[in-house]
Amino acid sequence: YFGQGVRVLYLDTGYELGHTAYDSLNLIAQYDFVNNDENTANETDQEILENQDNHGTLCLSVMAGYAPGNLIGPAFKSEYLLAKTEIMAEEIQQEEDNYVAALEWGESLGADIACASLGYLDWYSYEDLDGNSAVTTIAVDIASNLGVLCINSAGNEGDDPWYYIIAPADADSVISVGAVNRDGT
């Protein structure tokens, strides 16, 4: 089984779909919530191009990539909805609004799963991450109640001094995924 019959919404920075690992990607729809168009790759008329699609391309490949002998993602036969939600130049609250809009869009197109390796922290305190306050946390709970299985990274903070999960990983209806290095850090 390789994900047949499952529709996945993937939210991230953007995607370089010209990569050979995506030659057989079953792309149903894509939308750029940053620039309000249907191109989730780099666009030459955008102000910030650097690494615009790097994170999204890499993360999506873990799930959907198919390049025998190099990479085979576990769900390369799923149907995909791709949403570009992140503004690379800075961390701003608009990204959370984009995330929410993408969840609504994906749910309206029949997404079974919503997956993101994104999170929001800069404008929240530890106390705000209570599972009920962050905009994306509330949206993930609503999407889950509508039947969308939501999966999100626990955080993207790396070696930063913040050692807690970030929104929307604090939602009670999300599967939150984290990792540590070999030495436990």
Provide a role label for each language-model segment.
Residues 1-95, 109-112, 145-147, 170-174, ...:
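Subtilisin-like serine protease catalytic core
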Residues 59, 99, 103, 108-185:
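Catalytic-core segments of hydrolase enzymes
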